Swiss-Prot record:
Coiled-coil segments: 351-1006
Database matches in PANTHER family: CHROMOSOME-ASSOCIATED KINESIN KIF4A-RELATED
Residue ranges of domain Kinesin motor in the record: 8-337
UniProt protein name: Chromosome-associated kinesin KIF4
Compartments, record wording: Nucleus; Chromosome; Cytoplasm, Cytoskeleton
UniProt keyword Heme, yes or no: no
Tissue: Expressed in oocytes, eggs, testes and brain.
Location of region: Disordered: 494-516, 722-741, 1052-1078
Amino acid sequence: MGKDEGIPVRVALRCRPLVPKENNEGCKMCLTFVPGEQQVIVGTEKSFTYDYVFDPSAEQEEVYNSAVAPLIKGLFKGYNATVLAYGQTGSGKTYSMGGAYTHNQENEPTVGVIPRTVIALFREIHQRPEWEFNLKVSYLEIYNEEILDLLYAARDKTNTISIREDPKEGIKICGLTERDVKTALDTLSCLEQGNSSRTVASTAMNSQSSRSHAIFTISIEQRKEGDKNNSFRSKLHLVDLAGSERQKKTKAEGDRLKEGISINRGLLCLGNVISALGDESKKGGFVPYRDSKLTRLLQDSLGGNSHTLMIACVSPADSNMEETLNTLRYADRARKIKNKPIVNTDPQAAELQRLKLQVQELQVLLLQAHGGTLPVLNSMEPSENLQSLMERNKNLEKENGKLSRELGEAAVQTAQFLEKIIMTEQQNEKLGSKMEELKQHAACKVNLQRLVETLEDQELKDNVEVIQNLQQVIVQLQDESSGIAGSIEAMDEEAASFPVPEEDSGEKRSSDGFTTNHALRQAQLSKELIELNKALVMKEALAKKMAQNDRQLEPIQSEYLNNIKHLESEVGVLQKEKEELILALHSAKKDNNQAKLSERRRKRLQELEGQMTELKKKLGEQSKLLKLRESTEKTVAKMNQEIQGMKMQRVQLMRQMKEDAEKFRTWKQQKTKEVIQLKEKDRKRQYELLKLERDFQKQANVLRRKTEEAASANKRLKEALQRQKEAMEKRKDSQSKGMEGAASRVKNWLANEVEVLVSTEEAQRHLNDLLEDRKILAQDIAQLKQKTDAGERIPTKIRRRTYTVAELENLEEEASVTKQIESLETEMELRSAQIADLQQKLLDADGEEEMVKRRWETISNIMEAKCALKYLITELVSSKVAGSKLESSVKQNRAHVADLQKNIFEERNQMAEMETEHQSQLMQLEQHHQEKILYLLSQLQQKQASVPVTIEELPAEEITEREKQLMERLKFQDEEIEKMKALCEKNQQLLQENDMYKQKLALLHVASGKKLHNILPAAEICSPDSPFDFIPPKPRGKRRTNAKSAAVILEDLLSESESEEESDDKNWEPGNNSKQSKKLTSKCSCKARCGNKMCGCRKTKQNCSDDCFCDPSKCRNRDNHMDEGKHEDQSLESENSKIDYPDVTAGGSFFTPPCVTPTKKVLREISDIGQVLSIKLQRKPSTASASASVMESQENQTSILTKKKKVLCNSNTSFFSGCSAITEDE
């Protein structure tokens, strides 16, 4: 038994709670559930309504009892059923369906739909002992568009499975394993076996993600024990679909990516099928079931023979809002699908039942055909028989038509007469009732004759006589009405006795069906009306007679009542007398003398009993008469009700006859009008025929004038062509004008649409960035909370935003862990609010599906479509040109940056080579210089030791030769110094060029907004020939050190502002000595030991001199204290000379190889010795004290130089030792 109307697919929405991962990422709920309503709201405005809605607090049992349990009862009635779960990956489909069931979960509340369905199915089977059941189960999965048997023993072997379509049984799967099951335990073991074989893998969104679609099918065959023909077949499909996923969220690669593509392809085909079935405009159109194996297997479940329930599983997290919205729309379209389930009976039993019905129908037809034979006239030949029958048929049709018309007219007349009769009867009834009222009036009961005799006033006598005359008139009218009623009754009896002729069934056919039917119907209604009138008259007469009898019984009834009372009193008296006689008889039995008296009393008693019996009989008869009257009254009341009903029925019949007559009149008028129109058409055709004949006669004349008309026709043709050309030009002008207006309108519309779509995409990109930022914030908060719980001290984390150094220092000093967590949570709430606002705007921009569908309805004709296409092509070409320009400019910029970088590398390499060469030259010069100084010192000591005389005592030749030698040496030293200055200046120029290139590179980085590694390949950034690691500069708020290139300037080396305690200056940098040269004239006046920076000389990094006002014996900033602090100075030099330079690695810096460079103090002392010697040569001392002081100073300087030489020789550090790379904070 099929159902005429389709049953919609039911949809249940289930929302899972937020998982810990989503909580850790700071996700918020984006779904709102309306209490008491099956409705869910996405964001703030967009709402969806489904058959069932389950919020995150709903348990498995509630979902099953509300949505799935009603389908189980239909299975035992022969209907198929399907339950399928759809949703995003990780939304709870497998959990809801029980796709991961094991025997350990048997009694747990988390058991899904499939195990609960199996248990309920077998529970229902046990409650039907009069039926025999045969159950089979199968379990398959669709993995990468291949059907795999999950119950097949050896899944490694190829098991050929194909899909076939049976027109009677629907979709069948050939080669699939089906197992017979007897109990729920057997079925659940098959389910567990299939679950263990199902393909499952881990993704970034779900650790146990189903990678295939799974279908668990239970086939049920039920047959009644006593009736083999009463059997049903049904199937239950339990479908666990794989979740839709996005690669950027699942991070799928390799096989997982291929699986995800296959899953999305199958779900896309399923969505196309749902859209085709749910779209009312495409109803009856093509449905792409064959695009996927999943849709072919679900062909009966979607739009076919099945009761279907779809469980849409969604995630409430706002990070998955787009997927959730797609799922809700998907489910909303599924609600529009109409299935047509039918009862699946046994084919043999159904065929047998169909044949039985067919036999019954044939038997009825056979009876209607009078045994299946028609009368045939055997006395005539077949041709004569047919001809006579045709003639007879025509005659009968004519006669039938005539009789039908007459019958119709008679019926109309009868209806009119009956209507008049009814009205007359109504008036008669009214008059009769008034006559009865007058008759019952008190004036009619007065004896007027006696009253006339007694009255004396003549006027009163006249009035009484008038009243007496009126009484006589009333009596006469009553007699006349009774006579008319009697004659009417006699006429009715005669009409009833008149025989009604039987109708010939063979002559009922008429030529005009509608007229005949109308006449017959009017005749039938008239007949019914006449019969109704007869019955009504009879009943009215009977009711009147019964009423008269009742009125006649009224005095008898009163008399009977009085008699009954009298008899009852007599019976009472006799009863008392009887009781007294009985008592007297009992007393007489005791006395023998009163025998005669007792005998008389006994006789009297018998007489009394006889009288009492007669009185009781009379009393009973009179009671029966009273009951008879009561029953007569009830009968009269009932008859009156029937009379009223018959009158109403008569009125309805009259009304119906009037309506039929009016319809027939309207139809007849219409037909008459049509006949008139046809006659008019026929007349016109006759006229046209005559006209054509006249035209034909005129053709000869037309042929004669043919030559003359050729020229005029040619002229008219030219004129027509000219007019046509002008019309075409006008039409083109109007079209061009219209096209321009349409073009501007379409252009503006398309520009607006493109702007909206671009804004939507940008908003989506910003939304993804905000979600990622919130995820990072949630991770930071979780880490801080974990460390807080563990009791660790958390260092202040520097966020990715840019702070100044002072702000960072204040933040490190003042911020605490609690404040950090609170600030992060506030920032995360701000991100969540921005996310919700963006999502709502995206929802508003997206709009309903109908708005998306109506997007192109603005283009209504081909002209607008051409305008739109032209505009889109123009925009596409312009965008392509702009893109190519940008690409070419980017390529040029990259090439330019590469050239600049290459030049920088070359310059750096060249600078490094020059630096190494310069260092080597400096070292060689220093060695030569030291050798010369040592040679001079040795010569000076030897001379002093060998010749203990003064200079004045030396011969002039010797002094001259020595002076010449010293002058030559001084000249040589000056030349070397000039060379060193030139080299230093060249080095300084190279350093300035290097700084300029660095600034250019930094500007390029800021302009491009990209890192160097994104612009140039790695091979260009790090050249194998480069002896150092280049770190690209980044914009910084403030640097700890102003690291400059290590340039050695000769003026600084030779300045006299350096002291032996220069290692104490922690802020010393190369090239800063020019600032210190301004402080040479400072003097101190300390009263202590000059041991701290309160001393002016120590503060300016100078030794105290003789000009200072401090105590020489206590001062520790003089030369005599330097030997004591030698080792301390070395350690201070090695520690405090480290500044924030880039880290120096072996083979990776231009600061290699290490070299020993003299300090400024040594060079200064060397220059002092040269100055002393030059003074000696230029000026000869005049006194011995002067020569003694000079010799003493020479000895002191010699001892100091010897000490410094030992320090330099023992030191393993270079001038640039301790330099480290400047680490740039991210």
